[in-house]
Structures are given as C-alpha cells and as structure tokens.
Amino acid sequence: MKILVDENMPYARDLFSRLGEVTAVPGRPIPVAQLADADALMVRSVTKVNESLLAGKPIKFVGTATAGTDHVDEAWLKQAGIGFSAAPGCNAIAVVEYVFSSLLMLAERDGFSLYDRTVGIVGVGNVGRRLQARLEALGIKTLLCDPPRADRGDEGDFRSLDELVQRADILTFHTPLFKDGPYKTLHLADEKLIRSLKPGAILINACRGAVVDNTALLTCLNEGQKLSVVLDVWEGEPELNVELLKKVDIGTSHIAGYTLEGKARGTTQVFEAYSKFIGHEQHVALDTLLPAPEFGRITLHGPLDQPTLKRLVHLVYDVRRDDAPLRKVAGIPGEFDKLRKNYLERREWSSLYVICDDASAASLLCKLGFNAVHHPAR
C-alpha cells in the first residue's frame, strides 16, 4: 500500500508508515507521476484536489490535514467512490491565539484597552466559538454573526452582519469560503461593508483570502480610511497584492493555524480516519508526539492585567515574528510558499506552565488555555 503525504505534515511519515509505504511529496505543485501507483493521498490546503488531478488514478482515499475543505472537490470524490476526511477544528486554537497576539500588539501600540472594545465575530464554528469563549472569559463583549447556524436554530445570540458592522470596534472573519449560494462568503467584506466600519475599527481576516475583497480594501486604505487591518490570508495565494501588504498593520503568509499542536492534530485526525477506512483503526495520543516546549515554566505574581497577558502571550507567540519576513520577500515568486514550508516551530499557550500566587489569575489563565496552577506565596 503506497501512501503519499505532504512533506510539511509533521509526524506523517512516522504515523502512516504503520499502515503502508510512505512517500513525502511537495504539496504545490504536487508531482503527478507519483499518483500513478498510490492508494492514498494526504494533503494540506495548498493542494487542489479534483477530477483533473485524480481522474484515472488508483487513489482510494484523500485526507486533508486542514479544517477548511474549499481546495477539495468533495462532490467529485464522492461520485468517484474515493473516501475522504478532513480535520475539522485541528487548528482552531492556533487561529484564536493568532488573533489574540495581533490584538494585544495593536492595543499596546495604540494605547487602548481590549476591555473597552466590542468584538464582532463572523463565523461561529470551531474558531469563532473558541474565540468567543476566551474573549468573554476576559469580560470582553462579543457579537456573533453566522446566518447558517442562525437559520438552523443553533444555540447562540446571532446578529445580522449589518449590526456587527455598525457596533463592533473589531470585526474578525472565521468563515468557510462559499463562492455562491444563499450563504455566499466570497467578498463578504466588500467595499460597502469596509466603508461602513466604525472609524478606527480593526478588521481581521484569518480564514480565506477572498472573504475580504482585497482590491476594495486597498482602495479604502489608499483613500485614507481610518482602519487597522490584520491579514493572514490573501486573494490569489500564493501571489498577493504587495501594495495592500504595505498598507496593512499586520500581514502574514497564511500561518495563523500553524502551531505544532495544530499541525499534529491535523495529521493525527486524518491518520485515524484512514486507519478506520482500511479496517485497521488506530488512535494516537497527541502528547506522545509533541516535544518539550522551549519554556518549561514561569512564575506569575499578582493579578492578570492586559499588559501581563500581552507579555505571556508574546512569550509563546508574537505575531510580529511572522509579519516582518513576509514584507521582506513579498512579490518574489515562490517566497510565500517558502515561508510556509520553512515555518519556525510555534507552540500553543497550553505549552506554557504558569505558577500563579493569585488564585483568580490562575483560574483565568486556565480559561484562556494556559497550563496554569495556583500556589499561594509563602
């Protein structure tokens, strides 16, 4: 049994070798010749999986180690009788922590308190729900918009997108990309929406590039609209609008979900799905794969305020480390993908063990996802 795996899927070679012969390949462009005798294909979002790639090939199963699936033609796979699995929620924590790192940086730079801001969350799936929970743990007001979930009657106080635009100081997008249909998200943030944002608002896109109309956004910024922008995703990736990058406050190379934990979850989820598909079901404990974190433990004295939270968050991950490299190479062919391929190891907040002498600080840090314990000062 031959299994092709994306060379940037951590732990894939070790895990899938339990099931068959493993060959690691680049995801973009994928070497088509390797598909001629392969039984399974494991990809990331950079690989377009469709009829033109797989027609006439012996592939029986496709797994994507990503939460999003807009790069996969699921309807064709089903029609062709090819098994499929994604990894929903695998990188949700990573994306939430990317958003926090960005907001805390902007808050420090511009001198505002997040506690005084209202955050509008568009898309309340795995990422949006976790972001809401962490913001509300801090006492930060949130507004939710998710028409599909609202129409299904899912639990939640859902508001219209127009209301979020009018009321939110921070608007962050966490939707799939739907190019048509009743819940179309292509250019959901169009020129009209962008121009309607509150003066001084923060716009964040860490889902799919085309959810925000990049041309319209650049037009508004060039005209002097007072707006802070965080973009991790871009229309036309791996190409991007270099002039837009120059205008945004934070720009990164589609790496919001790139924690070691998130990548490992993606790999293990598709591994478990494929093992079940072939009748040799196996399960993997994530902590048996991960290395020891760079910082073993830290001691925190006193309560948790915004500056202290910012220092803790940036000790684990400061978004600026990913902004600067993209600006250096933007517009050079191939460099966007190189940044992703050679991404520096990044951990999640749970990797940091925090000893607190303040019980409320320990409790709050746990709610935020840190590995925190309370030890009273002696």
Curated annotation (Swiss-Prot):
E.C. number: 1.1.1.290
Any one GO biological process: pyridoxine biosynthetic process
Reactions it catalyzes: 4-phospho-D-erythronate + NAD(+) = (R)-3-hydroxy-2-oxo-4-phosphooxybutanoate + NADH + H(+)
Record key words, sorted: Cytoplasm, NAD, Oxidoreductase, Pyridoxine biosynthesis
Binding site for NAD(+): 146, 175, 232, 257
Subcellular location: Cytoplasm
Keyword Cytoplasm on entry: yes
Pathway(s) where this gene product acts: Cofactor biosynthesis; pyridoxine 5'-phosphate biosynthesis; pyridoxine 5'-phosphate from D-erythrose 4-phosphate: step 2/5
EC class: oxidoreductase
UniProt-listed PROSITE patterns: D_2_HYDROXYACID_DH_1, D_2_HYDROXYACID_DH_3
A cellular component annotation (GO) from this entry: cytosol
Positions with a binding annotation for substrate: 45, 66, 258
InterPro entries: D-isomer_2_OHA_DH_cat_dom, D-isomer_DH_CS, D-isomer_DH_CS1, D-isomer_DH_NAD-bd, Erythronate-4-P_DHase, Erythronate-4-P_DHase_dimer, NAD(P)-bd_dom_sf, PdxB_dimer_sf
Active-site feature positions: 208, 237, 254 (proton donor)
GO molecular function list: 4-phosphoerythronate dehydrogenase activity; NAD binding; protein homodimerization activity
Signal peptide start and end residues: none
Induction comment from the UniProt entry of this chain: During growth rate.
Record Pfam families: 2-Hacid_dh, 2-Hacid_dh_C, DUF3410
Record's keyword annotation contains Cytoplasm: yes
Cross-referenced NCBIfam families: PRK00257.1, PRK15438.1
Subunit structure: Homodimer.
Family under the similarity heading: Belongs to the D-isomer specific 2-hydroxyacid dehydrogenase family. PdxB subfamily.
Described function: Catalyzes the oxidation of erythronate-4-phosphate to 3-hydroxy-2-oxo-4-phosphonooxybutanoate.
Protein name: Erythronate-4-phosphate dehydrogenase
